[in-house]
């Protein structure tokens, strides 16, 4: 496994101290880790400050930490929160880097081959490489990850062995250095771009694969390195110097030459065996031979090929069926694993492997891939559990699995620092529920900044209710899995900004949606037993109203199901704990005030485009650089809407520059 090098301390920055039952939860969780307890549960209600508790535990135990979330939206939210808590430490983000992904597949019944199609998000690729660099270099690393952490990536041994350490005063033949950078997946380029380098006289500028704020400038006298400077990648203005530097590869799939040669030999051996298997099936034989030999030639020439991950077992030296190397292998043995919303995340861990294997079966069976492609896969749940040496399951509604594995090490965190108790749900008849809901919505629309969440049982019903309310002049929309991640984030922002008053959803409104403006949660057809109306789901839905002092929950049902009964009893129990605490400490519930990050250029966009038309060519070039820098900065902070506007301004400046240059040429 990978190991940390630098031994910095986690330094927690927080404008407040632990309160309520946070101090006891922090103490018990920290002590459990120190005592070697393998699994613990933090059972924390919505709004009780679970993330703050996690941050305190991380600071106390001071070991590399992986926080696992079940979707990208929650991972981004946790990443931002931990970045604020640990500004001095390496807080990283590791999710799937695909903006679009159509996996390779073959449908035998229609003889249809679907080639893999994808669009990689450059910014997320950078963040992934930054994450692995940090965990190999320093112990004060906290990585927030989606389920991507169990998918195969290159070996940490190969990755770290391809890192290049340079020291001032030593000799590095320039041609050899350039060749080494190419082998590390940096490309020679005359323009500044990530994972690239350029040579100008005695200087080599390297634009790092894992860093957008800094580039590296190497200055030579003949072949002797006389200076290493960090510079701004846009302006090339020096920031600071260093006497040595370690440069990490531009891809997780880099391999030393000896490993690559061995991999080519074993790929050829597997191909020969498969040719014998397909004896009498010339179509499959030819198909597999052509593809595999082409891939081998590409690996020989440039060390890479399209779909190289399907040969990953050959590069790691693993036996057939052995677990792939993944992000978890980059961590040292003593790392802490925190699984957020564990009741959702653990079932996801179980499901990933089965779906992957069923898709690849036909690819291998019909000669599109070698059988080793099966080993380019996510971990099975049993394989993933081998890394659970120190795990904290975090959930308001932990499942039976977490309860069982924790063996009684369950720490409750029920009390909210705000003093807001769980709203006690009202049960109303399902008959006429839409008319009753409409009246409740109208009551809240008369008040300022109170929003409504409506939980339906199907996507179609969510869309129909949104359309019905919109026809009545109510600002309503729906949210479900058919909507892209970026658009979901924008919808939630619009709700907080007041552009939307009513949001109708199915399942996405359960965990992690932090909306203090929501004063009413209406659960339609609450008596329809099933996954979306289980006691855990109902408790999670009710928690969405527990951030507002006027919070109210209405369950529309004609009967009280066992799940509803459990939800009502558990809500009453938690409510009593909070009210008793409030009375004992003379606490008056206070509303949560959570700032909304406004877009600083929304009102000025039109003025900016007008100003561009008045600029000279030189000024436009400067504006393009400024907008590009602002775009990447906004993307780093996960303000994607803001980043898109800077992108549009950058493109407008580029068009204006082309127009002006055309006019200048015509004028000449």
Swiss-Prot record:
- Extract the Pfam families matched here: Helicase_C, ResIII, UVR, UvrB, UvrB_inter
Chain location of the short sequence motif Beta-hairpin per the record? 97-120
Positions of the Helicase ATP-binding domain: 31-416
Q: GO annotations under biological process?
A: nucleotide-excision repair, DNA damage recognition; SOS response
Which parts of the sequence belong to the UVR domain? Answer: 621-656
**Matching PROSITE patterns:** HELICASE_ATP_BIND_1, HELICASE_CTER, UVR
Q: Which GO terms describe its molecular function?
A: ATP binding; ATP hydrolysis activity; DNA binding; excinuclease ABC activity
Domain Helicase C-terminal, residue spans: 433-596
The record's section on PANTHER family has:
UVRABC SYSTEM PROTEIN B
HAMAP family recorded = UvrB
Q: Which family does it belong to?
A: Belongs to the UvrB family.
Q: How does it assemble?
A: Forms a heterotetramer with UvrA during the search for lesions. Interacts with UvrC in an incision complex.
Q: What is this protein called?
A: UvrABC system protein B
Q: Which organism is it from?
A: Chlamydia trachomatis serovar D (strain ATCC VR-885 / DSM 19411 / UW-3/Cx)
């Amino acid at each position: 496994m990978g190991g940390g090098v630098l031994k910095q301390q986690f330094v927690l920055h927080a404008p407040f101290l632990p309160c309520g039952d946070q101090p006891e939860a922090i103490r018990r969780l920290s002590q459990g880790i120190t005592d070697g307890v393998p699994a613990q549960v933090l059972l924390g209600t919505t709004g009780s400050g679970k993330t703050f508790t996690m941050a305190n535990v991380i600071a106390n135990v001071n070991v590399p930490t992986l926080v696992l979330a079940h979707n990208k939206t929650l991972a981004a939210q946790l990443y931002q929160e931990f970045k604020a808590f640990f500004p001095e430490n390496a807080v990283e983000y590791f999710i799937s880097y695909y903006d679009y992904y159509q996996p390779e597949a073959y449908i035998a019944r229609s003889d249809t081959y679907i080639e893999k199609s994808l669009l990689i998000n450059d910014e997320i690729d950078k963040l992934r490489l930054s994450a692995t660099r940090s965990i190999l270099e320093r112990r004060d690393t906290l990585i927030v990850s989606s389920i991507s952490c169990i998918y195969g990536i290159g070996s940490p041994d190969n990755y770290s062995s391809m890192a290049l350490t340079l020291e001032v005063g030593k000799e590095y033949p320039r041609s050899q250095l350039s060749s080494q950078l190419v082998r590390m997946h940096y490309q020679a380029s005359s323009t500044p771009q990530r994972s690239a380098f350029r040579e100008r006289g005695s200087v080599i500028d390297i634009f790092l694969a894992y860093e957008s704020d800094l580039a590296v400038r190497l200055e030579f006298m003949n072949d002797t390195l006389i200076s290493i400077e960090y510079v701004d990648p846009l302006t090339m203005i020096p920031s600071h110097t260093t006497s040595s530097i370690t440069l990490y590869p531009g891809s997780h799939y880099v391999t030393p030459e000896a490993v690559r040669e061995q991999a080519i030999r074993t790929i050829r051996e597997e191909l020969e065996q498969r040719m014998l298997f397909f004896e009498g099936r010339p179509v499959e034989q030819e198909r597999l031979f052509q593809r595999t030999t082409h891939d081998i030639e590409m690996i020989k020439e440039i060390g890479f090929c399209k779909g190289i991950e399907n040969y990953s077992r050959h590069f790691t030296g693993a036996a057939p069926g052995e677990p792939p190397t993944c992000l978890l292998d980059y961590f040292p043995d003593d790392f802490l694993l925190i699984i957020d919303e564990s009741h959702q995340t653990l079932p996801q861990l179980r499901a990933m492997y089965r779906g992957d294997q069923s898709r690849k079966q036909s690819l291998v069976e019909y000669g599109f891939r070698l059988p080793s492609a099966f080993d380019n896969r996510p971990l099975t749940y049993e394989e993933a559990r081998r890394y659970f040496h120190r795990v904290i399951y975090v959930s308001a509604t932990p499942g039976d699995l977490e309860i069982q594995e924790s063996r009684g090490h369950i720490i409750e965190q029920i009390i909210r620092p705000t003093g807001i108790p769980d709203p006690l749900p009202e049960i109303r008849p399902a008959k006429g529920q839409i008319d009753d809901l409409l009246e409740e919505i109208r009551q809240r629309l008369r008040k300022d900044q109170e929003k409504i969440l409506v939980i339906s049982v199907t996507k179609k019903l969510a869309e129909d209710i949104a359309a019905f309310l919109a026809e009545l002049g109510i600002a309503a929309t729906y949210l479900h899995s058919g909507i892209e991640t970026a658009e979901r984030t924008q919808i939630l922002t619009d709700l907080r900004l007041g552009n939307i008053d009513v949001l109708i959803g199915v399942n996405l409104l359960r965990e992690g949606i932090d909306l203090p403006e929501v004063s009413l949660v209406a659960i339609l057809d609450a008596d329809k037993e099933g996954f979306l109306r289980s006691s855990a789901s109902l408790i999670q839905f009710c928690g969405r109203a527990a951030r507002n002092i006027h919070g109210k929950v209405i369950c529309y049902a004609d009967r009280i199901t066992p799940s509803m009964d459990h939800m009502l009893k558990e809500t009453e129990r938690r409510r009593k704990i909070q009210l008793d605490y409030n009375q004992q400490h003379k606490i008056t519930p206070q509303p949560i005030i959570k700032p909304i990050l406004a877009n600083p250029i929304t009102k000025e966009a039109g003025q900016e485009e007008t100003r561009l038309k008045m600029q000279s060519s030189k000024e436009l070039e400067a504006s393009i650089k400024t907008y590009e820098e602002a775009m990447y900065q906004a993307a780093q902070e996960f303000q994607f809407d803001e980043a898109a506007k800077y992108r549009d301004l950058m493109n407008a400046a580029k068009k204006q520059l082309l127009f002006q240059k055309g006019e200048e040429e015509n004028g000449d």
